[in-house]
Amino acid sequence: GAADKGHASVVTLLLADERVDPNMTRRKGFTALMLAARRGHAPVVTLLLANDRVDPNMASQVGNTALIFAAIKGHAPVVTLLLADGRVDPDLTNQYGRTAITCASLNRHDSVVKLLLADDAVWIN
């Protein structure tokens, strides 16, 4: 889809259409926000977060949120955008009991771990 490929102009058109559900899931329960976050498409993540119909805490079939996907892949700019959105819960866990900070640490993404540690909303266990 457009979000997965980073096509911001197409995402803008789709979000303008009230008939389009921005939280619709694809295979494995991925939403547009999860796909954009996983690929590191910061401009698309920005567009999606600006839309109040987007639920940034939705989780895939295995419980990964957009923040967890960005943390797994080490996309620091996307993690920054997600943490800045007051709706994002940084402490949600996937089915393996892992939070975004755990995933970033396991994948050795030090810059993402530092961002998460600096955020007061992140609970350090």
Regions inferred by a protein language model and the residue ranges of each:
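Ankyrin repeat A-helix N-terminal signature
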Residues: 1-7, 35-41, 69-75, 103-109
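Ankyrin repeat structural motif
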Residues: 6-15, 41-49, 75-84, 109-117
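Intrinsically disordered, low-complexity regions enriched in serine, threonine, proline
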Residues: 16, 24, 35-36, 50, ...
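Ankyrin repeat (ANK) core detector
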Residues: 31-34, 64-69, 98-102
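Ankyrin repeat start-site detector
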Residues: 27-28, 61-62, 95-96
